Amino acid sequence: MVPFLKILAELIGKGVEIRLIHAKEPGQPFREDFDRYPRLHKYLERVLCPRVHFKCIIIDGKQAYFGSANLTGAGMGAKSENRRNFENGILTDEPSLIEPLSEQFDSVWRGANCKKCGRRQFCPDCPIT
């Protein structure tokens, strides 16, 4: 299995813009893997929002995956057979599903909910001061 971070770094190398919203700073093993891909440091746009629990990937507003899996070895099926999580998800090109996902992602990205969020003290990327 090709590491997810390697795929992201290769896409960035091809000029693909990638935005990532995550709920907390990743643990040490992930950070060590992340450090292997200098392009990610320079070009991956990311925002930390402690309220985010959704998992979705939107590609050019035309395709989307959404489901329960975290982007971890256990969530993505990279662990040994007996250590994988039971997950589900949907891959779609249906605009009626993609549009609300895109709207939700963009809303969080812009910080639309930051003023009323009770966790701003944990959010270093909140655009509202």
Question: Where is each model-derived feature located?
Answer:
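PLD/PLD-like phosphodiesterase catalytic module centered on the HKD motif
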Residues: M1-T129
